[in-house]
Amino acid sequence: MAKKLIPTYESVADELTATAEAVRSQMFGMPCLKRGSKAFAGDYHGAMVFKLRGEAHAQALALRGAHLFDPSGRDRPMKEWVVIPAEHAAHWPEFARLALETVVEAR
């Protein structure tokens, strides 16, 4: 029986930079993915962060351990950004595509 591979930030980034107009960049000192000048996903201490809205935002926050992204650590979270821990890595590719749509729609 073949072992199912768990997505990593690198595998998600590889897929989106190969198939979408996404590029690797940096945001707050962390590796991130951007479309144009807009960041939509990033690698944060072994978790991934995603810029999400609406139902996708609610679904992400419903995952155990997920929370709003607070890069300053001063209780000032970025309201559209959700940290999804590695235990939910199987969902990362889906949330990355939804986050990409968020910045595409904003154009």
Locate the predicted segments by residue.
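Charge-dense, helix-prone N-terminal extensions
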Residues: 1-107
